[in-house]
């Protein structure tokens, strides 16, 4: 039975991928810094490892693996470029080197659409769009560099592919879903520009579907080898529709407050200045990058991922919101 290594399995996406692999009978090893007791209880192995630390430790953690799903990353909108580079570029370079050292045949990398979002509207872009991350986002800059490393590593011994899931949400999400709900409960949620711009998020099960398809389809010389693919639900909707859908699932009223894009951008600039001045490490309520993201459209064509990986995005937005509401009712998350 093949051994699949999953990095970042304590996170929302990595954990969901690991559970799906275990459910279908794969041998799974979770490699990361924090323990994953819930996944160990399901049969996963666990190796504690700082992927940006010593190369020898990373090589040992990947020993015996047939495939690696590299999901681990430092995400978010706050932190130094050096912090993001260490977690996202250095760690990825060491994962690639460890794959080569151990003769791993397949590497699936979790990237982000932010690698092509320079700050303006992105409507219906496909994978021919050049890498052009917004320099205001250390995360996007570091992920673009890491994706480039992964795609360049594709050769006759190691097949690689990068996936770019967009705005992952669903039960258990501590980022997008949890922040929308928390800010609404605190009376701090605003729709930038009225929430009219189109976005296309990814329900968690669809993100998992794409990763498992990539794992199964990826071989040396396969159509997907060396490529990157956008992943989403395939249902662009106004931002307010998704936001208010999440609020309704949590039993909260829709967001009726808005803020002009220019005002959000100025607020972000001021908060960034204050945060830098105080040396704070927590994320500000607004940054210039977030203001740009919320004030622009960003949705992508899925023709390539459907053609090469057989991706369907089986859970549509309405069904995802129904499942989210059920989760809030039963577990509160």
Cite the ranges covered by each PLM segment.
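Amphipathic terminal alpha-helices
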Residues: 3, 300-308, 312-333
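N-terminal Rossmann NAD(P)H-binding glycine-rich loop of SDR-like oxidoreductase domains
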Residues: 4-24
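NAD(P)H-binding glycine-rich loop region in Rossmannoid oxidoreductase-like domains
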Residues: 44-90, 98, 118
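Catalytic helix-loop patch of NAD(P)-dependent Rossmann-fold dehydrogenases
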Residues: 90, 121-168, 189, 197
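Conserved Rossmann-fold NAD(P)-dependent oxidoreductase catalytic core, especially the SDR/UDP-sugar
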Residues: 94-138
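Substrate-positioning beta->alpha
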Residues: 145-146, 174-179, 193-217, 226-230
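Conserved C-terminal active-site "lid" loop/helix of NAD(P)H-dependent oxidoreductases
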Residues: 204, 244, 267-312
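Mid/C-terminal beta-alpha module of Rossmann-like enzyme folds, strongest
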Residues: 217-284, 322-325, 333
């Amino acid at each position: 039975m093949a051994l699949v290594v999953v990095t970042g399995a304590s996170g929302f996406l990595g954990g969901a991928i690991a559970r799906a692999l275990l459910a279908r009978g794969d041998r799974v090893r979770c490699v990361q810094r924090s323990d994953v007791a819930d996944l160990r209880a399901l049969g996963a192995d666990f190796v504690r490892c700082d992927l940006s630390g010593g190369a020898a430790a990373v090589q040992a953690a990947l020993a015996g693996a047939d495939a690696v799903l590299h999901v681990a990353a430092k995400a978010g909108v706050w932190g130094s470029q050096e912090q993001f580079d260490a977690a996202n570029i250095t760690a990825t370079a060491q994962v690639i080197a460890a794959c080569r050292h151990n003769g791993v045949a397949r590497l699936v990398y979790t990237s982000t659409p932010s690698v092509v979002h320079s700050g303006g509207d992105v409507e219906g872009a496909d994978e021919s769009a050049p890498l052009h991350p917004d320099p205001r986002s250390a995360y996007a800059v570091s992920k673009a560099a890491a994706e480039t490393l992964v795609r360049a590593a594709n050769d006759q011994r190691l097949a690689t592919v990068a996936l770019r899931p967009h705005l992952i949400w669903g039960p258990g999400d501590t980022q997008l879903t949890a922040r929308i709900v928390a800010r609404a409960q605190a009376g701090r949620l605003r729709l930038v520009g009225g929430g009219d711009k189109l976005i296309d998020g990814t329900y968690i099960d669809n993100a998992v579907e794409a990763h498992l398809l990539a794992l199964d389809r990826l071989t040396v010389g396969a159509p997907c080898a060396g490529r990157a693919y956008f992943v989403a639900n395939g249902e662009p909707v106004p931002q307010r529709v998704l936001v208010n859908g999440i609020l309704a699932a949590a039993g909260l009223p829709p967001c009726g407050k808005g803020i002009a894009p220019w005002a959000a951008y100025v607020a972000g600039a001021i908060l960034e200045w204050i945060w830098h001045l105080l040396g704070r490490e927590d994320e500000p309520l607004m940054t210039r990058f977030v203001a740009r993201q919320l004030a622009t459209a960003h949705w992508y064509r899925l023709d390539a991922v459907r053609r090469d990986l057989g991706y369907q995005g089986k859970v549509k937005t309405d069904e995802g919101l129904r499942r989210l509401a059920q989760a809030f009712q039963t577990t509160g998350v």
